[in-house]
Amino acid sequence: MGFDRQYSREFVRTFFTSPAAVTDAEDSAKMLQKGAQLRGMQAPDVWVPDNEDATAPVMRDEGVQNIVEVVAQHGADFPGEIHPRIVWHRPDPAMRYRGLQQMVKIADPDAGAIDHIDGFVIPEVGDVDDWKKADEAITQAETQHGLEAGTLS
């Protein structure tokens, strides 16, 4: 017996974060590789390759490259949404610029990952001014690569 909803609602059942790069490992992308290959009930609705809190600052450049490579390789088969988390700190313009650069690298169509990325997690966005700065950065990443406005969220 079917059920007709009187409304439409979307929700996230689960999300999963993976460090974008780990130190002291033969393969710094090993945690991303594991997250990208989760399937069935083990797979989250949203996977967050985390290049912020979960990744050591000295590993973040490598983390961006790992995100690009792993998502390009496994993104088409991942059953949920993919939202990489970039660095972003509202009081620090230099950190916001690094976050923009991370988005630009991840969104590069020639790198092969962007077709599988649903958006970005931008941490520490607080007031309306923060939202505007984050939106401006996303728009810059889209524009730089000729992506349609709204491609990234």
Model-derived regions, located:
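Conserved alpha/beta-domain cores
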Residues: 2-153
